[in-house]
Design a protein with these regions (language model features):
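Cell-wall glycan-active module
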Residues: 1, 91, 115, 135, ...
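A structural motif
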Residues: 111-120, 140
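Conserved active-site-adjacent core of cysteine acyl-enzyme catalytic domains
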Residues: 1, 7-111
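Extracytoplasmic/periplasm-facing segments of secreted or lipoprotein envelope proteins
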Residues: 19-24, 28, 125, 129-136
Length: 185
Protein backbone atom coordinates (compact mmCIF):
# COMPACT_ATOMS: atom_id res chain seq x y z
CA UNK A 1 0.00 0.00 0.00
CA UNK A 2 1.13 3.52 -0.63
CA UNK A 3 -0.04 4.73 2.77
CA UNK A 4 0.96 2.22 5.43
CA UNK A 5 -0.60 2.30 8.88
CA UNK A 6 1.35 4.30 11.39
CA UNK A 7 3.15 2.50 14.20
CA UNK A 8 0.93 4.21 16.76
CA UNK A 9 -2.79 3.46 16.69
CA UNK A 10 -5.21 6.30 15.97
CA UNK A 11 -8.52 6.57 17.77
CA UNK A 12 -11.34 5.06 15.73
CA UNK A 13 -13.35 8.25 16.38
CA UNK A 14 -10.86 10.18 14.20
CA UNK A 15 -11.25 7.93 11.16
CA UNK A 16 -13.98 8.31 8.57
CA UNK A 17 -15.12 5.07 6.96
CA UNK A 18 -17.41 4.53 3.99
CA UNK A 19 -21.11 5.36 4.21
CA UNK A 20 -22.09 2.34 2.10
CA UNK A 21 -20.97 -1.28 2.21
CA UNK A 22 -20.27 -1.38 -1.54
CA UNK A 23 -17.39 1.08 -1.21
CA UNK A 24 -15.75 -1.03 1.52
CA UNK A 25 -16.33 -4.15 -0.59
CA UNK A 26 -14.56 -2.37 -3.44
CA UNK A 27 -11.58 -1.80 -1.09
CA UNK A 28 -11.63 -5.55 -0.39
CA UNK A 29 -11.84 -6.37 -4.09
CA UNK A 30 -8.80 -4.14 -4.72
CA UNK A 31 -6.84 -6.43 -2.42
CA UNK A 32 -7.77 -9.25 -4.82
CA UNK A 33 -6.52 -7.14 -7.73
CA UNK A 34 -9.98 -6.08 -8.93
CA UNK A 35 -11.18 -2.50 -9.28
CA UNK A 36 -14.71 -1.76 -10.47
CA UNK A 37 -15.30 1.46 -12.39
CA UNK A 38 -17.98 2.60 -9.95
CA UNK A 39 -16.67 1.61 -6.50
CA UNK A 40 -19.99 2.30 -4.79
CA UNK A 41 -21.67 -0.35 -6.96
CA UNK A 42 -19.38 -3.20 -5.88
CA UNK A 43 -21.47 -6.14 -4.70
CA UNK A 44 -21.25 -9.84 -4.04
CA UNK A 45 -23.16 -10.44 -7.27
CA UNK A 46 -20.53 -8.54 -9.25
CA UNK A 47 -17.75 -10.40 -7.44
CA UNK A 48 -19.28 -13.72 -8.52
CA UNK A 49 -18.92 -12.69 -12.17
CA UNK A 50 -15.14 -12.90 -11.70
CA UNK A 51 -15.11 -16.12 -9.65
CA UNK A 52 -15.10 -14.60 -6.15
CA UNK A 53 -17.78 -15.45 -3.62
CA UNK A 54 -18.86 -13.60 -0.49
CA UNK A 55 -19.18 -15.29 2.86
CA UNK A 56 -21.02 -13.26 5.51
CA UNK A 57 -21.36 -14.36 9.10
CA UNK A 58 -20.73 -13.40 12.72
CA UNK A 59 -17.45 -14.24 14.46
CA UNK A 60 -14.99 -13.03 17.05
CA UNK A 61 -11.44 -11.80 16.64
CA UNK A 62 -9.98 -15.29 17.14
CA UNK A 63 -11.99 -16.57 14.19
CA UNK A 64 -10.89 -13.56 12.15
CA UNK A 65 -7.28 -14.55 12.80
CA UNK A 66 -8.09 -18.14 11.81
CA UNK A 67 -9.63 -16.98 8.52
CA UNK A 68 -6.43 -15.04 7.81
CA UNK A 69 -8.24 -12.97 5.17
CA UNK A 70 -9.26 -9.34 4.99
CA UNK A 71 -12.93 -8.72 5.75
CA UNK A 72 -15.50 -5.94 5.45
CA UNK A 73 -16.91 -4.83 8.81
CA UNK A 74 -19.27 -2.14 10.07
CA UNK A 75 -18.10 0.06 12.94
CA UNK A 76 -20.41 2.76 14.28
CA UNK A 77 -22.48 2.74 11.05
CA UNK A 78 -19.41 3.16 8.84
CA UNK A 79 -17.87 0.50 6.61
CA UNK A 80 -14.20 -0.51 6.72
CA UNK A 81 -12.00 -3.28 5.38
CA UNK A 82 -10.15 -4.98 8.22
CA UNK A 83 -6.85 -6.15 6.77
CA UNK A 84 -4.77 -7.12 9.79
CA UNK A 85 -4.95 -7.83 13.52
CA UNK A 86 -1.70 -7.61 15.42
CA UNK A 87 -0.75 -7.17 19.08
CA UNK A 88 -3.51 -4.91 20.24
CA UNK A 89 -4.04 -3.00 17.01
CA UNK A 90 -6.16 -3.49 13.92
CA UNK A 91 -5.39 -2.18 10.42
CA UNK A 92 -8.38 -0.73 8.57
CA UNK A 93 -8.36 0.16 4.86
CA UNK A 94 -10.43 3.09 3.62
CA UNK A 95 -9.82 3.86 -0.05
CA UNK A 96 -6.01 3.89 -0.39
CA UNK A 97 -5.23 4.68 3.24
CA UNK A 98 -4.47 2.21 6.02
CA UNK A 99 -5.33 3.25 9.58
CA UNK A 100 -4.13 1.49 12.72
CA UNK A 101 -6.65 1.52 15.58
CA UNK A 102 -6.66 -0.06 19.04
CA UNK A 103 -8.37 -3.48 19.05
CA UNK A 104 -10.28 -2.47 22.19
CA UNK A 105 -11.97 0.37 20.26
CA UNK A 106 -12.72 -1.95 17.36
CA UNK A 107 -14.38 -4.43 19.73
CA UNK A 108 -16.49 -1.68 21.31
CA UNK A 109 -17.82 -0.61 17.90
CA UNK A 110 -18.14 -4.00 16.16
CA UNK A 111 -21.10 -6.39 16.31
CA UNK A 112 -19.06 -9.33 14.97
CA UNK A 113 -20.66 -9.24 11.52
CA UNK A 114 -18.27 -9.54 8.60
CA UNK A 115 -18.03 -10.36 4.91
CA UNK A 116 -15.03 -12.01 3.30
CA UNK A 117 -14.25 -13.05 -0.25
CA UNK A 118 -13.03 -16.44 -1.37
CA UNK A 119 -12.07 -17.81 -4.77
CA UNK A 120 -14.14 -20.70 -6.04
CA UNK A 121 -12.33 -23.92 -6.98
CA UNK A 122 -12.49 -25.16 -10.57
CA UNK A 123 -15.97 -26.29 -11.52
CA UNK A 124 -17.67 -24.77 -8.47
CA UNK A 125 -21.19 -23.58 -9.20
CA UNK A 126 -22.97 -24.06 -5.87
CA UNK A 127 -22.37 -25.68 -2.47
CA UNK A 128 -21.48 -29.37 -2.81
CA UNK A 129 -22.75 -32.24 -0.70
CA UNK A 130 -23.70 -35.93 -0.66
CA UNK A 131 -24.16 -37.37 -4.15
CA UNK A 132 -22.36 -34.58 -6.03
CA UNK A 133 -19.45 -35.24 -8.38
CA UNK A 134 -17.27 -33.24 -10.75
CA UNK A 135 -14.19 -30.99 -10.71
CA UNK A 136 -15.21 -29.16 -7.52
CA UNK A 137 -15.58 -32.45 -5.62
CA UNK A 138 -12.23 -33.67 -6.98
CA UNK A 139 -10.64 -30.40 -5.85
CA UNK A 140 -12.21 -30.77 -2.38
CA UNK A 141 -10.88 -34.32 -1.97
CA UNK A 142 -7.37 -33.17 -2.94
CA UNK A 143 -7.45 -30.15 -0.59
CA UNK A 144 -8.63 -32.24 2.36
CA UNK A 145 -5.80 -34.71 1.68
CA UNK A 146 -3.30 -31.85 1.88
CA UNK A 147 -4.91 -30.36 5.01
CA UNK A 148 -4.98 -33.76 6.73
CA UNK A 149 -1.41 -34.66 5.63
CA UNK A 150 -2.65 -37.63 3.65
CA UNK A 151 -1.13 -38.78 0.42
CA UNK A 152 -2.36 -40.86 -2.42
CA UNK A 153 -3.85 -40.24 -5.79
CA UNK A 154 -7.47 -39.48 -6.26
CA UNK A 155 -9.26 -40.52 -9.37
CA UNK A 156 -11.26 -37.88 -11.19
CA UNK A 157 -14.99 -38.31 -10.85
CA UNK A 158 -14.96 -38.83 -7.10
CA UNK A 159 -18.46 -38.94 -5.61
CA UNK A 160 -19.20 -36.90 -2.49
CA UNK A 161 -20.06 -39.73 -0.08
CA UNK A 162 -20.58 -40.19 3.66
CA UNK A 163 -16.83 -40.50 4.32
CA UNK A 164 -16.15 -37.19 2.59
CA UNK A 165 -19.03 -35.60 4.48
CA UNK A 166 -17.39 -36.64 7.79
CA UNK A 167 -14.08 -35.08 6.65
CA UNK A 168 -15.85 -31.85 5.69
CA UNK A 169 -17.61 -31.74 9.08
CA UNK A 170 -14.28 -32.29 10.88
CA UNK A 171 -12.72 -29.45 8.89
CA UNK A 172 -15.69 -27.20 9.63
CA UNK A 173 -15.46 -27.93 13.36
CA UNK A 174 -11.73 -27.16 13.51
CA UNK A 175 -12.21 -23.85 11.69
CA UNK A 176 -15.21 -22.62 13.67
CA UNK A 177 -17.74 -23.14 10.88
CA UNK A 178 -21.14 -24.76 11.29
CA UNK A 179 -20.49 -28.50 10.83
CA UNK A 180 -23.19 -29.18 8.25
CA UNK A 181 -21.05 -31.34 5.94
CA UNK A 182 -21.77 -29.08 2.97
CA UNK A 183 -18.77 -27.54 1.22
CA UNK A 184 -19.23 -23.97 0.06
CA UNK A 185 -21.28 -21.04 1.19
Amino acid sequence: YSNRASTYPTSLRLIRGHDIAGAALNDLLQLWGVDFTDPDSASCELAETIGLFCFSSIAGLNEMNDFDRPVVINLNNQWFTLIELDRGSASLKVDNTIHSVPVAELLDAWSGNFTLLWRAPPGYKAPISIGDRGPAVDWLVNRLQVINDRTGPTTPGYVFDGELEVQVKQFQLTTGLTPDGIAGV
